[in-house]
C-alpha cells in the first residue's frame, strides 16, 4: 500500500467507515488511483502534447468546439465538468491535428483548479 492509499485509509476510518466490509476493503486503493488519474495533468507538459504539426496555407482561425472535459476544484476537491471551445490562428504556416487540441484540454483539465 503506497502513501496515498494509507492516507485515504486513515481518512475513511476517521469518518467511521468500516473498511472491513466486503465492498469497502479495496476502497482506499481505488480512491487513490482515481485521484492520481484526476490530477495526472500535473505531471504532463503541455508542449509534449502537440506532437507533429502540419504545414498549411490556411490563414484563418481554426475552431475545435464542444470538447468535453472534467476537472477538480482545488477548494473542496469537488468535480466539475463541461465543454470548451478552442479557437486559434495557425502560426508560421503550421497547424495542429484536431485531436491534439482535445488532448491539450484534457492535460490542463487534469490539474486541480478554481471552479468559480
Q: Which ranges hold each PLM region?
A:
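N-terminal intrinsically disordered, cationic/polar leader segments
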Residues: 1-116
Amino acid at each position: 500500500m503506497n502513501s496515498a492509499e494509507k492516507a485515504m485509509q486513515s481518512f475513511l476510518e476517521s469518518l467511521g467507515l468500516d473498511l472491513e466490509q466486503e465492498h469497502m476493503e479495496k476502497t482506499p486503493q481505488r480512491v487513490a488511483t482515481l485521484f492520481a488519474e484526476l490530477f495526472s495533468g500535473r505531471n504532463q507538459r503541455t508542449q509534449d502534447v502537440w506532437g507533429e504539426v502540419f504545414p498549411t496555407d490556411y490563414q484563418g482561425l481554426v475552431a475545435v468546439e464542444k470538447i468535453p472535459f472534467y476537472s477538480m476544484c482545488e477548494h473542496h476537491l469537488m468535480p466539475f465538468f463541461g465543454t470548451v471551445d478552442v479557437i486559434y490562428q495557425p502560426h508560421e504556416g503550421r497547424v495542429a491535428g484536431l485531436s491534439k487540441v482535445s488532448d491539450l484540454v484534457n492535460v490542463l483539465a487534469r490539474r486541480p483548479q478554481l471552479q468559480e
